[in-house]
Amino acid sequence: MGHRIKTQNRGRGGPTYRAPSHQYKAELKHLGNDKVTVRGVIIDIEHDPARHTPIALVRLEGEGKKVYLLVTEGLGVGDQVAWGPEAEVKNGNTLPISKIPTGSYICNIEARPGDGGKFVRASGVQAIIIDKTVDRVGVKMPSGKMKWFSSRCLATVGVVAGGGRGEKPFVKAGKKFHKVKSQATYWPRVRGVAMNVIDHPFGGGGHQHTGRPKTVSRGTSPGRKVGSVAARRTGRRKR
């Protein structure tokens, strides 16, 4: 009887290969819009398994509702934050990008007005407002590229907290395990030639080479489609 290889199981999408999104705390979308201003106070700083950036629990003024906010560097418990056109231009506040001065650091930028924030949300990153026109704002992204946004898009003033996270080495495999466990990543990744023959077409044989050509056609059956799929060329390039 045939045996499903890991590539097939990944495509099936079982629990092993799915992100544990039921453990995630919040989507972290902007409140308010370019016409309504919402204010609140930070009551706690928490960790969210969905991301490497700390998140803040905010109690809104008036109604007492609690929401989560993406934390920028320098924010702490007891700080006031606001979303909307009447918000002050200060660290942690969110307002239309057209109202933020040129040269300011911003993060959590909306791709389209009202979508809640899509760009510049990873730990320690920031974008810079470079240019403005009547209805668009030019922003230098963390990649160095220039991107234009609608002047009605909301953005948060400041740099995302958690900078320098990638500089600390994992050191131990157990630390890496817990990091990967919160993502849709299968880890560790075992080489096909190191597997048993039942687990992979390149496995078995008591040797560490494929034992057969690595190239396979585009229409090959799923259990055999491993290696160089529909490759135009293999090996080193000729000079």
From Swiss-Prot:
Family: Belongs to the universal ribosomal protein uL2 family.
Species whose genome carries this gene: Methanosphaerula palustris (strain ATCC BAA-1556 / DSM 19958 / E1-9c)
Purpose: One of the primary rRNA binding proteins. Required for association of the 30S and 50S subunits to form the 70S ribosome, for tRNA binding and peptide bond formation. It has been suggested to have peptidyltransferase activity; this is somewhat controversial. Makes several contacts with the 16S rRNA in the 70S ribosome.
GO biological process, one term: cytoplasmic translation
SUPFAM superfamilies xrefs: Nucleic acid-binding proteins, Translation proteins SH3-like domain
A GO-annotated cellular component: cytosolic large ribosomal subunit
Keywords: Ribonucleoprotein, Ribosomal protein, RNA-binding, rRNA-binding
Superkingdom of this protein's organism: Archaea
Annotated GO MF terms: rRNA binding; structural constituent of ribosome
Residue numbers spanned by region Disordered: 1-20, 202-239
The protein's name: Large ribosomal subunit protein uL2
Subunit structure: Part of the 50S ribosomal subunit. Forms a bridge to the 30S subunit in the 70S ribosome.
